[in-house]
């Protein structure tokens, strides 16, 4: 436990050691584009150049954030350079959420979540991108999932952090409407990102994001994006039934890594999403001692998981591996040797003592459970 605490404190520090708390929010060597789509203008930021026929890493942020506050701590993390040297990165900002965005005109109809997903194909076409590996958080994870369901040929893999695949129930909708009259939108967004324990214990991090949401994000535009997210439809994904080959079944066909911190308010939703996805190509990563923004609080662990995820897809095979990846490789070596996907076994990896525990019965090769990893 002491080791986990040391890692957590070390990785939070770079976010907070600047006087304004935004040091790792900065972009480096990027190009910005405003791209017109049938559903309006979208702002994108490109890091690096496309590498041959490799997919581009495309990110989509959550409500109350933009690509800088959601992803730059992660992509500026030192170990991520081993990945970004092999891939171009395309950060997408939802309409009106980018830094210094002007307010929309009165009466502007903000795109629905489905329409936000349909803004992505014109972006890829404009930038001559053939396919993506998506990384989405919260609302961004939902948008990328919808995009992958509608355009599976354009998506090679997805990393979905804090995803909620369900529509907002009418009781939740009514509660959010009532709370909107009595609660500041900043507090609503903070409660979306962080659980009560984190809100009370990690005061520096919470203050950093409170100021960012209140001062750096256009409040009128944020209200519109929040309304769009609250009005989302159910993704209507279904877990395939063993032995049944039904092309009409709606599910994510690409390799998928689900990520959630064990103290995140999104745990229940992510577990629900996991239960609906094909276990053959899905991995669920539960990050210990972690709250609602694992890419910010523990970028090292997430980088290692992402590196291993890319290796499983056949990319960057020479990348270095730390204990998390080595323990997972050891526990799946027999299945890989027999031609089985490393993502088709259920394994729990304990970083604190380097041990791993198989969750399958010894006499049955489990090919139909999602791999669940704790780190």
Swiss-Prot record:
Polar residues bias: start-end ranges: 347-359
One GO CC annotation: cytoplasm
Keyword DNA repair assigned: no
Organism of provenance: Mus musculus (Mouse)
Compositionally biased residues, Low complexity: 330-346
Basic and acidic residues bias: start-end ranges: 364-375
Keywords of the record: Acetylation, Phosphoprotein
Annotated family: Belongs to the NDRG family.
Start and end residues of each stretch annotated as Disordered: 326-375
One of the GO biological process terms: decidualization
Modified residues (Phosphoserine): 331, 334-335, 338, 341, 352, 361, 374
Name recorded for this polypeptide: Protein NDRG3
InterPro entries the UniProt entry points to: AB_hydrolase_fold, NDRG
N-terminal signal peptide: none
Residues bearing PTM N-acetylmethionine: 1
Phosphothreonine: residues carrying this PTM: 322, 329, 332, 355
Pfam families in the cross-refs: Ndr
Tissue expression: Expressed at high levels in brain, followed by small intestine and kidney (at protein level). Also expressed in thymus.
